[in-house]
UniProtKB/Swiss-Prot annotation:
Top-level enzyme category: transferase
Catalytic activities: carbamoyl phosphate + L-aspartate = N-carbamoyl-L-aspartate + phosphate + H(+)
GO aspect biological process, one term: 'de novo' pyrimidine nucleobase biosynthetic process
HAMAP family: Asp_carb_tr
Originating organism: Nostoc sp. (strain PCC 7120 / SAG 25.82 / UTEX 2576)
The protein's name: Aspartate carbamoyltransferase catalytic subunit
Amino acids binding L-aspartate: 89, 184, 248
EC number: 2.1.3.2
GO molecular function, one term: amino acid binding
Domain of life: Bacteria
Assigned GO CC terms: cytosol
Pathway: Pyrimidine metabolism; UMP biosynthesis via de novo pathway; (S)-dihydroorotate from bicarbonate: step 2/3
Function: Catalyzes the condensation of carbamoyl phosphate and aspartate to form carbamoyl aspartate and inorganic phosphate, the committed step in the de novo pyrimidine nucleotide biosynthesis pathway.
Amino acid sequence: MPTSTWNRHHVLSLADFTAAEYDIVLKTAASFQEVLSRRTKKVPALQGQVVANLFFEPSTRTRSSFELAAKRLSADTLNFAASTSSMTKGETILDTAKTYLAMGTDIMVIRHKEAGVPNAIAQEMDRLGVRVSVLNAGDGQHEHPSQGLLDLFTICSLIDPANPRLELLQGKKIAIVGDILHSRVARSNIWSLIASGAQVHLAAPPTLLPKFFAEYIFGEETAPPGQLFIHWQLEPALQEADFVMTLRLQKERMTANLLPSLREYHQLFGITRAKLQLCQPNVKVLHPGPVNRGVEISSDLMDDPEFSLIQSQVTSGVAVRMALLYLIGSGKT
């Protein structure tokens, strides 16, 4: 496995990922994808290590994917649920993390509704001088690094299954459509796609895509010229697009009525076969899930393997999360 140039102890964000790190993840994931195609889908890479999945927010795909990834690497797993934990009795997040540390945890996979929680736990582990890695499984509206990486792997593997790599997306047009304002997935995908040299076109109603969004993402820096575009109509984003990523409307994060109705949203921004006629003939559609059928994407299109990569994303997720756990855990054995 290509770990010789991997020096990252935690995976908290894709904002500072290098091209070399992206390629290491892609190549390692491809190796594990091959493992998952075997009859015996297990390797002893992390045997004896403990992976704790600390999910303070509901999750189906990400939590199950990380648990399966850890088990495929022969790690022992601990699964945390906030509703049945001592947090209901007043225990703090950091004290919960320290409890799992005392049990001998090697890797903590953290999801929380508030941005910055995985980073705070990583800083505390570093302050304590312990060799515990933290992997961000989604923090508020901040980032979702493993989802961004699995989306990247899904696309690159489609283009070149034998050798998925970052440069394959150079010059490709990627449309990201939907609730971009509240989406941590969009933020991670923007970082990875910009790094690849792709053209990223964001499309959403103005209430879900403020004009200052690029400044919000990049801070004092500016997006590379000719790589990030903002549209308040769908058609310009879809025109000649190679891939379309559609995002769930996160109604649970909306503090106001940002849309007239779901029906109107689907008419204007929902992805359908008819709208895909604006794209490249071999366009593919992605969605991080869970999907609101008939809102972000038509039900028939979601189930059509000619266009939809949604199930491939789920499959890719296990291999990519195996790669991340292996890369940050391989130095602990």
